[in-house]
Amino acid sequence: METIAKHRYARTSAQKARLVADLIRGKKVSAALEILTFTNKKAAALVKKVLESAIANAEHNDGADVDDLKVAKIFVDEGPSMKRVMPRAKGRADRILKRTSHITVVVSDR
């Protein structure tokens, strides 16, 4: 049984979150949680929270055994970018893009 959890509009770029997602794809959830706990990146904390949510969803909604679960799929899509302005010299301004991403984790007992 596949169970999904999503974090939409996560305040990290998709490029940075994908580096973390690649670390846990296909692993058992217990191993994935350990990896994320000791990964020193901001995106690791965000991905860990989504993974914990997926595990809780599987246990509560589908009655799955946590020991059998593995990360079947994990992907990170780009969300909308927030446009901001940074003042520069001589009255100019630069545009800053604050990027967001959508993190999706699918856990399965198969």
UniProtKB/Swiss-Prot annotation:
Keywords: Ribonucleoprotein, Ribosomal protein, RNA-binding, rRNA-binding. GO terms for molecular function: rRNA binding; structural constituent of ribosome. GO terms for cellular component: cytosolic large ribosomal subunit. The keyword rRNA-binding applies. Pfam families: Ribosomal_L22. InterPro entries: Ribosomal_uL22 (IPR001063), Ribosomal_uL22_bac/chlpt-type (IPR005727), Ribosomal_uL22_bac/org-type (IPR047867), Ribosomal_uL22_CS (IPR018260), Ribosomal_uL22_sf (IPR036394). GO terms for biological process: translation. It comes from the Bacteria. PANTHER family: CHLOROPLAST 50S RIBOSOMAL PROTEIN L22-RELATED, LARGE RIBOSOMAL SUBUNIT PROTEIN UL22M. Part of the 50S ribosomal subunit. This protein binds specifically to 23S rRNA; its binding is stimulated by other ribosomal proteins, e.g. L4, L17, and L20. It is important during the early stages of 50S assembly. It makes multiple contacts with different domains of the 23S rRNA in the assembled 50S subunit and ribosome. The globular domain of the protein is located near the polypeptide exit tunnel on the outside of the subunit, while an extended beta-hairpin is found that lines the wall of the exit tunnel in the center of the 70S ribosome. Belongs to the universal ribosomal protein uL22 family. This is Large ribosomal subunit protein uL22. It comes from Glaesserella parasuis serovar 5 (strain SH0165). The lineage of its organism: Bacteria, Pseudomonadati, Pseudomonadota, Gammaproteobacteria, Pasteurellales. The gene is rplV.
